[in-house]
Amino acid sequence: MLEKETINFEKTIIVGIVTQNQSEEKLKEYLDELEFLTFTAGGEVVKRFSQKMERPNPKTFLGTGKIEEINLYVLENGISTIVFDDELTPSQQKNISKIIDCKILDRTHLILDIFAQRAETSYARTQVELAQCIYLLPRLSGMWTHLERQKGGIGMRGPGETEIETDRRIVRDRIALLKEKIKIIDKQQATQRGNRGAMVRVALVGYTNVGKSTLMNAVGKSDVFVENKLFATLDTTVRKVVIKNLPFLLSDTVGFIRKLPTQLVDSFKSTLDEVREADLLLHVVDISHQDFEDHIDAVNKILLDIKSADKPTIMVFNKIDAYKHLTIDADDLMTERTSKHYTLQEWKNTWMNKVGEQNALFISATNKENFEEFRKKVYETVREIHITRFPYNKFLYPDYEDAIDKEEEQDQD
């Protein structure tokens, strides 16, 4: 599980619903993630609210009684922000704001806000601003009037903060301008990718906060920002990496997440092009997270959406040093054994059977456990792709064993 440091941030409550399609257990998983998203954005979750419903209320998302209960809690406890786990319609957000006098955000808005904080380059900031404008355009009529007296804080950051006004025409013009700006930069990025020469391209993909940047640093000996927060990496980092005299390009891409806003998928076209144009994907998984299989499914869904699901892929199960599983007492005859009771070896057997023994690696990027095995597998796969793609390349690569012998001789000297 993700560990949080104690900081006095905005007092926030988070809200979700249990439906026929979303069990209480699944809601808890989503709210755990939403709480960490809130922490990453600068909020401290002090209370959770949930309600069982067949479907969301089209007017206020929750039932009238639950809305009143939340409103009373907000008034009595000085809550500044409410975050709903599902995306609210513009009318739902407007109706809730009429009843509860605080910032009303949803999961999409929160993720956009985090991206706004994390954007370092001009290009990333432009992408985020476009996503924010597209999201906020249908919500302008009620949202900004209600929030104008609540300056700053969660949900109010980013490049688009000062530009967004209640005039829809101005925002539409801004969207058109940003799209044109991104189109120009995309062409430049495509040209740059085309000029990288005859080298195999490898992309690190995976759920957010699974250790991709740590792995990037360990493999590429580069200095990529690493932090135990969601979306610590936003701008794509590309490094030339050499393993055993074999050079290739390694890119560390933005982490995926469940319920990833479509606005971000559309806006971050060039970032995702690093994945689309890769010859090999290293799908990094935090096996110590209790929901890691759901995370794999979420990543695979996005890879399918961007037409990259059929690329050669190595599953890299990271953080094996932190893996823990549930146990059942010997005299407990009632508890049913599930995948949450699997040992690490059982997971190894499961995934090696599922994707092939050579395509499932179990490592710890932090303490370098099984790291040489990982480097060897990457080397062998990249070398095979290189020989296939560039059969007439004059640069000859030694066999792996020869390279090891040569490296050992150099070390002895």
UniProtKB/Swiss-Prot annotation:
Family that this chain belongs to: Belongs to the TRAFAC class OBG-HflX-like GTPase superfamily. HflX GTPase family.
Pfam families given in the database record: GTP-bdg_M, GTP-bdg_N, MMR_HSR1
Cofactor: Mg(2+)
Assigned keywords, A-Z: Cytoplasm, GTP-binding, Magnesium, Metal-binding, Nucleotide-binding
Protein task: GTPase that associates with the 50S ribosomal subunit and may have a role during protein synthesis or ribosome biogenesis.
UniProt-listed NCBIfam families: GTP_HflX
InterPro entries, per the entry: G_HFLX_dom, GTP-bd, GTP-bd_M, GTPase_HflX, GTPase_HflX_N, GTPase_HflX_N_sf, P-loop_NTPase
Domain of life: Bacteria
Hflx-type G domain sequence ranges: 200-386
GO cellular component: cytoplasm
Subunit (UniProt): Monomer. Associates with the 50S ribosomal subunit.
PANTHER family for this protein: GTP-BINDING PROTEIN 6-RELATED (PTHR10229:SF0), GTP-BINDING PROTEIN HFLX (PTHR10229)
Residues that hold Mg(2+) according to the record: 213, 233
Localisation: Cytoplasm
Name of the protein in question: GTPase HflX
Major localisation: cytoplasm
GO terms assigned for molecular function: GTP binding; GTPase activity; metal ion binding; ribosome binding
Positions with a binding annotation for GTP: 206-213, 231-235, 252-255, 318-321, 364-366
